[in-house]
Swiss-Prot record:
GO terms for cellular component: extracellular region. Disulfide bonds join 3-22, 17-39, 41-52, 53-59. The keyword ATP-binding does not apply. This is Fasciculin-1. Its main location: secreted. GO terms for molecular function: toxin activity. Expressed by the venom gland. Keywords: Disulfide bond, Secreted, Toxin. It comes from Dendroaspis angusticeps.
């Protein structure tokens, strides 16, 4: 699966992931900034909302 991968300070690049899922991590509270994207599906918490997706490629835009 092709996923976008970056942190808050890096430019987004496309990564070919071994996992079948991508994630997009963002703040739950305003300002709702996107804090990173990448491979897999890490858990969220009270501050971070993690949206995971499995298809199509680049689904974590």
């Amino acid at each position: 699966t092709m996923c976008y991968s970056h942190t808050t300070t890096s430019r987004a690049i496309l990564t070919n992931c071994g996992e079948n899922s991508c994630y997009r991590k963002s703040r739950r509270h305003p300002p709702k900034m996107v804090l990173g994207r990448g491979c897999g599906c890490p858990p969220g918490d009270d501050y971070l909302e993690v949206k995971c997706c499995t298809s199509p490629d680049k689904c974590n835009y």
